[in-house]
Every structure is written in structure tokens, then in C-alpha cells.
């Protein structure tokens, strides 16, 4: 799978370069956000043009089959990426029960101290925790949040979410 991701990233970057989309003088630049289930995958993503990577730390990660990073690996990943101008987004995109909130708060606190660039979140309770514990770190709504309407996007923005990954079920025709 890692080879396929690298191949797709190379094709994508070639297309961007051919179109002359350097980000200079344009209203918006496409961000290449790549999954990183290991340090090896993270390095491959960065070396092949990813602007940002997303990864899991601890237990609040919906990427089934992906290994979560330890605290030491998370710190190593953040340093590796930041030295190269690449952002690290932490996935906290599972539903979190009341009894898990204290652990989620600890994960948010640790990740913020280590310097993650954004949280990718599903649970509204976790959105509130992120705002309370790490208000300087942007919050992105995960596709698992199932936002599929303009009203949903507006509500997420009111809750402090700066980016929304729309629901997978949303037809292309409805995305404007």
C-alpha cells in the first residue's frame, strides 16, 4: 500500500506542477494530506511531496489496521515534519464515551505540547475538549462527523472547527 500511495503522490505532484499551481498568486493551494501509519510511511509521504500528514496516537483513531504512534514516535514525527515544513494532523476521530474523556484530554494535552498542527475530530465532546485544552490548535471535522449540508458546516464553524471533511456519502453534485 505504501508504494501505491507514493506512486499516486508523484502523479498528483506532477499534475500540479504541469498546471503551474505553485500557490503564488492563487486564491487557494491544494494541500496534499497523506496518511502515515508508521515512521516509514511518514518519511515516504514527506519525501514525495506531502504538505501534511495525519496519524494516530493512543486509542482514539478510526484508521482500522493502522498502528498508532507512541509518544516518542509522535515527537519524532513532529520534529521530522516541522524541520521540512510539513504539518502533522492528529486523528481523534472516534466516538469517545464519558469514561474515556479524561484519557482523551490527556492525549490532547500531550499532542499540543509536542506541537501537532491540527486535530481531526469526530466527537463533539472532543471538539469541546480541544477548544478548552489547546485553543491555539486548529480543529478539523473528520468525515466520520458526517457533515453533509451547509448548515452542518456552519454549525461546525460556530463550534470552532476550521476545516470540514464532508461526509463520504455526499454526492459530488451537491458539493459547491
Tell where the protein language model's regions lie, with residue ranges.
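Non-catalytic helical/linker scaffolds that mediate oligomerization, partner binding
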Residues: 26-176
Amino acid at each position: 500500500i505504501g508504494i501505491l500511495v507514493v506512486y499516486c503522490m508523484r502523479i498528483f505532484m506532477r499534475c500540479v506542477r504541469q498546471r503551474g499551481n505553485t500557490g503564488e498568486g492563487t486564491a487557494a493551494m491544494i494541500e496534499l494530506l497523506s496518511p502515515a501509519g508508521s515512521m516509514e510511511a511518514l518519511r515516504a509521504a514527506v519525501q514525495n511531496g506531502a504538505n501534511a500528514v495525519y496519524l494516530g496516537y493512543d486509542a482514539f483513531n478510526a484508521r482500522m489496521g493502522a498502528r498508532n504512534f507512541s509518544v516518542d514516535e509522535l515527537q519524532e514525527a513532529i520534529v521530522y515534519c516541522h524541520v521540512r515544513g510539513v504539518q502533522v494532523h492528529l486523528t481523534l476521530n472516534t466516538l469517545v464515551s464519558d469514561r474515556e474523556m479524561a484519557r482523551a484530554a490527556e492525549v490532547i494535552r500531550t499532542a499540543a505540547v509536542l506541537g501537532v498542527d491540527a486535530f481531526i475530530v469526530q466527537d463533539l465532546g472532543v471538539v469541546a475538549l480541544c477548544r478548552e485544552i489547546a485553543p491555539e490548535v486548529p480543529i478539523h471535522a473528520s468525515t466520520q462527523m458526517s457533515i453533509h449540508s451547509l448548515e452542518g458546516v456552519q454549525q461546525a464553524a460556530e463550534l470552532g472547527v476550521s476545516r470540514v471533511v464532508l461526509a463520504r456519502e455526499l454526492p459530488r453534485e451537491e458539493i459547491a
